């Protein structure tokens, strides 16, 4: 747990603010290098910071490659203007370490260069766990919503790319009174281009890992949410209950939901012959 935590302590200056994303992050220089900072005062509100932190922490918990990430206190010593014209507020925000690479352009060609191809299956799983519609989903009216720029390919060499999990700010953990969402069958994050890269063994491994998720594991993450992110005690309890219940549901159903059950069954029968 927390294998990818990053703990810079202060922001020295802003390097770039024209990043067109819903939370209007800014590229900053910290005492420990460059990072993308999402601040209080962002146009999406403080709850999105909590969702970002929890979603990234859950990906980290499952062993999925993420950016190094953390919570950093902004003291207001410098003024940080956001792209929408707002001003970053003092208090704790979410930060990820900058990496060399680029967002995905939707091509199969780039997916074939990914060295951690198993993380495609795992990313679909964590998106489905937290009900994150902001990478890929199909709305109820049948219209697909896709954001290629929410898939980052870290460049470790000229030929090899590493898929990195990020951006969970719109995850729908649970709404008050809608506990049934824990048993929702919708698959999130499964771009059509991803389907040929789904791996049966990765799906089985992550399903087995979800079986081990207990309330204490989720509570350890939820308890780290800063008070200024405005998630009260009742909502924290709802998130814990929902995430544990949904982990249990997906541990039994994820393989079927992404269409790999028949493949695994055929392989099992073959192995027994």
Question: Residue locations for each model-derived region?
Answer:
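Aromatic-acidic/polar surface patches that form glycan- and anion
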Residues: 47-48, 115-119, 243
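Conserved kinase catalytic-core segment
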Residues: 108-177
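Conserved ATP-binding subdomain of kinase catalytic cores across diverse folds
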Residues: 2-102, 129-133, 168-171
